[in-house]
Amino acid sequence: EIYLKGFEMVVKEANPWTVMSSYNKINGVYTSESYDLLTTILRKEWGYQGMVVTDWFGGRDAVGQVQAGNDLLMPGKIRQQDSIRQALKTGKLSMADVDRNVRRVLELILKTPRFKGYPYSEQPDLKAHASVTREAAAEGMILLKNDGKTLPLAADVRDIAVFGNTSYQFIAGGTGSGDVEEAYSVSLEEGLTGAGFILDKGLKQHYLDYIRAEEAKIDWKKYNHVTPPRIVECTLDEGLIRRKAEETDMAMITIGRNAGEYSDRKVKDDFELCADEREMLEKVTRIFHQEGKKVVVILNIGGVIETASWKDRPDAILLAWQGGQEGGNSVADILSGKVNPSGKLPMTFPVRYEDAASSENFPLIGDEEALDIYREFYTGPKGTDRPNIDFTRYEEGIYVGYRYFDKYRVDVSYPFGFGLSYTGFTYSKPRYLRTEQGYEFSCTVTNTGKIPGKEVVQLYIAAPGKTMVKPQKELKAFAKTKILAPGESEVVRLVVGLSELASFDEQASCWAVESGRYLAIWGSSSRDCRLKQSFTLRQAVTGEEVHRVLLPVRQLEELY
């Protein structure tokens, strides 16, 4: 229902050529050694026909990996080859298993453009690729706050004071295997300059000199495989800030966060703002507001941070994420009004970290413990049994994310699905049609403002919840409209299959759809419901029974 669902959708709808097994165990068994996961579920139940590859150095038992249906072991070690040969000699491993895996590897090779002699080019259209990156990043950026129509920037706003280290070293993406060697990375400062804004040169040089000096103190080799340390914000005296407030039209502050493999994020000075960031935010907003100037905060982050304690200070907040090589240009497009923001939050921003249901079971182990993970590729894990370090209990049950916040009526800073626009939208004329496969829902979305824009329409379903434990409502479909001119409308149609209404019956090991009155809820976020319509399923539906696998090996006390 929760953790396998996304993978199932990808496998069934996209039919990928390869699937990678992960490092972790599920209920006591490494994923790369789990026949239940890689064969019973992935192949027998979902019909997957492609190749499965391990993550680098994943798992411990090469023979078990081959038997489980892990076709390619990466990067490949001599001891793995030796153990497979020995298992073939003793009969522990059958040649049929090896042949099956080899066949899948060869089938992948036969499908590749290289094998088919595709005449690849050494001259890709890099400008076109950059244009796609710029557009995609802007589409996903989210306007969290916009008091007094601060954004888009007015025509008389030209001179800007830009504060924050990452304004000048914009974070393009995370660390580890997710990192890429981009050809260039456009900073916020460069993006704003390219859009015709004038940035304070003295402040820019002050930051560049400071960042250069601080980077020289870092032993970068130590952080080859983990997230590098955050550079503390430089100290700015109030006299300097006041001069900038007098000389410029407004201020921008960038808050940056980086993350990647080998270490999890932390609460203090990561989820929460650091003391130096709070000081910068307090000083800049107070002094610029005293001068009647506005302040915009740009969040150059890859995950959730705490916002409730400080979001009342700036006039506008843009969640820019980590926008790739064109990130600074993408932000400038939104700030200038060239692009109307249309992104929506894919997660909830809680008031406090402790408000999240998963907070009691999250492995907050710190960087030193994380460094051991890299060594354990070669030595194997220590074999201890420490909760939230060596294993984690997923005790939220089905109440993951917004489902938990809704069920227990927990106040949030920004709800799931939230995102503002420079214009406004109304929803009307809800309809639904029963089809052979499920339901087709539709509603009309109209741009009621004065600026062209897009809206992400979200469809939540509230189940009867009489015979099965169900969330208050769940997102079942969503779509983004085209660019709607002022006054223009679009009919949005969303399809929800009957199987999407099903829950997993643990006792019967099958999917089931309960009968009764359902509610279709059209919303602009999980807590901004615009339209409601009811429909009735008169007869319960029991789906095909599935294999009883991946059962928990520890006692779980799930939320209900």
What would you call each of these model-derived segments?
Residues E1-E506, C510-W522, S526, R548-Y560:
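Glycoside hydrolase catalytic-domain context in secreted enzymes
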Residues D528-E544:
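Short beta-strand elements
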